[in-house]
Amino acid sequence: MNPWRLLRACLQRFSAVFKGSQSQQSFADEIESHLQLHIEDNLRLGMTPEQARREAILKLGGVEMTKQSYRERNTLPLLDDLLQDLRFALRQLRRSPAFTITAALMLSLGIGASVAIFAFVDAALLKPLPYRDPTRLAGVNEAVKLFGRAPLSYPDYLDWKRLNNVFSSMDVFTGTGFMLNTSSGAEPVEAARVSDGFFRTLGTTPVLGRDFYQGEDLPSAQSTMILNYATWKLRFAGRMDIVGQVVQLSGEPYTIVGVLPEDFHFALDGGAEFWVPFHAKGECDLRRSCHSLHGIGRLKDGVTIQAAQSEMQSIASQLERQYPGDNRGQGATIELLSELIVGDIRPILLTFLAAAGLLLAIACVNVASLLLVGSESRSREIAVRGALGASRVRIVRQFLTEGLMLVTLGCVLGLGLAGLGMRLLVSLIPKHFFEGMPFFLDLGLGWHAIVFTGVIAGMAGVLFAVTPLLRLPLTALRFGLAEGYRGSTGTVWRRFGSSLVVLELMIAVVLLVGAGLLGKSLYQLLHVNLSFNPDHLAILTVEAPPSLYPKDENLIALQRQIISRISALPGVESVGLTSVAPVSFNGNTDWIRFVGRPFNGEHNEVNLRDVSADYIKMLQAKLLRGRLFSDSVDGAKPKVVVINQKLAEMYYSGQNPIGQRFGNGSLDPNSIKEIIGVVDDINEGSLGSPIWPAVYYPIYQDEDNSFTLMVRTSQSEASILPALVSTIHSIDRGVGTRGESTMSTYIHDSPAAYIHRSCAWLVGGFAALALVLSMAGLYGVIAYSVSQRTREIGVRMALGAQRSSVYQLILREAARLTLVGIVLGLIGAVGAATLMRTLLFGTAAWDVGTLASVAVVLGGCALLASYIPARRAASVNPVEALRAE
């Protein structure tokens, strides 16, 4: 056939499908006109009207056969049948609005929750990092006794970079802070110090200006900086002539040389606005024992992460032998950069996705139960269609179309709920959390989420198509018109419906137990013993620019003036300063070596905290032995320290630590300190983290330009925060403040508390919805069972059965289903809780109290859900029941 004629025929058939009855009616009218012409010719030949019509029809070859032949030649039968199925499915949904609305709402809840959580999983775990060839990027850190992932020292970085053969490039970064002079005064800003090739290793090129030159991170190089895109827009109005401008940071001039792309985010930079070269000028930068840097490297082609780990560990061992005093016990930790960024939140997101998936499963099972109930009323319809010649394939296709239509409606509503849910969840994430999770900033329903929704829709559509057919086997096509058919399948349906209810209850138990364990874990975390009183405490960080306070004596004078002025404020009871706030992180560590003991290369790592004399008293922590610091203790006096109980137990077990001395790994004379006191184990690390050995130094003996001010007040701690800030600015407007908060809020908003609270609330919400849906499913099955057993109940009551026995009959069935669901659910819940044990704090996966509580709650709800059908069954009139049958 000519290809153009073939194309024309195909287009004609395709268009005829959508023209529908209009095209067929036009052809029928034309056939009828031809038929009338032939009839008139036959009448003129003297035939009777009947003979004339008969001969005309014979001449045309049969009118109906001609119409059918036209339809077959000018339409696509399969597509035409599909459109018929769609129209019929729409009529079915409109005919049962209550069923349609109920099923669509159930599906939308499950689909919306699953898609919303999947969007978070997609953004964090599935999408590649926004860098060139991100699978070749690795995080490079050290490994020590207390840390599996520890910062590098600058000398170690130089050696690692020089000696390795696995990275084509290797660079470092570290967070820092500056004071930026603004119209309102000095403002603390976040920044990052990076080596010269940092952005080249990532594969990022500035959109304006240039990258750092090679060697621009050397101490002798000029002070330059690259701006974050948002900083360029907000602080500098997006000026195109910004390159070359000079900005004062902490009193030092920095020349702007470039602007980063708008889509550049680095999750580990602490929200840096300014990027400056790493100039190793400070005393800490040059010490091998001072660890403050994090590394990134680009793997050479063909090098695996395992090979990189092996070589860097070998280099670390070589440096340990070369520098035994500083590098004792130091290893290497090499991992993919993606794992470094999202590894900690992976189990959380997967837990959320599993919970949402279980909720979706309950919703689908509930809708399947509704379809089973609805299939009872359609048994006669299916039997009639089978009697008229409809094949089983056509009937299956019809049910599949109806299922897909229902799922499509649920998907449309679910995508709307997913969009709302994502915006709600993102709005609940504290702003400072986005610094470590920038991939959530532009969260949306991408093509991954659309494909995920399509997969859900396809699977659910098939489930909803198959479910009614389980109720209507082939025998329904033959016997569906018979009166006895319903009774022959009622028992089978009840068994299948009961299995669905058990499945619902089992899933609900798993979610409820998970929510209960996470809720208990949150309670345990928020009530953990901090060893200090967090009530009525205000906290803020003070930034004193090094250009204004270059020497220790300048800083000491400022700190003493701050303490004096703050102490004079109304309602202030005590004031303390510390280098690191409690309940923040375990870090800022050093290695110690004990005077008078043999040294065998032990790696004794401890937390270091510089605190003022009244700091321990201000916290209301217990002094267990010895004494605290006094104001007379300063840099000119012998160095003294206070230790925590953990350090005393680890290194002075059975001894009195008071008067004992220790120093750094080399026992330099200037590093020797004497222990004057032992205090309780203050929670220095993140909420709920293990207690580490800690050493408290007098803050005047080890100065830092950034320190934390803590104030205990007799009034509302929130109300005193403005007075604290204004008092500090009245001393010197060049001194900045940030992080103003109450200690209670500080703890409440801490990462550990937020993560546990999010897990508990989100999984708890899913569990509550699962409980409601499972109870609705149980109610539906019991109610339908009662309707199917009306005649049986009527016969029982006619033979003398009491209402109480009918109650027992129905409630016994509900209790059996509930018991099986609870037992299976508890078994599954313990297994699921074991998988998420990393999210639990102070709570066992098999916590008996939680398991028992869930069993009681679910059992009570099941009793209530079954009571109404049971009461209806007990109210059956035997005469009316038998007459109805």
What are these regions (language model features)?
Residues 70-101, 337-342, 371-397, 401, ...:
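Alpha-helical transmembrane segments of integral membrane proteins
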Residues 129-177, 290-296, 523-525, 529-591:
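Membrane-proximal extracellular/periplasmic loop immediately following the first transmembrane helix
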Residues 363-407, 776-818, 822, 872, ...:
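Interfacial "coupling" helices/loops that link adjacent transmembrane helices in transporter permeases
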Residues 97-124, 128, 362-365, 407-412, ...:
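Short, strongly hydrophobic transmembrane alpha-helices
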Residues 121-137, 143, 270-283, 331-336, ...:
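Short juxtamembrane loops and helix-capping segments at transmembrane helix boundaries
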Residues 117-120, 368, 404-477, 517-520, ...:
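Small-residue-rich transmembrane alpha-helices
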Residues 9, 177, 190-214, 222-350, ...:
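Mid-to-C-terminal secondary-structure elements
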Residues 1-105, 298, 317, 321, ...:
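Negatively charged linear elements and acidic catalytic determinants
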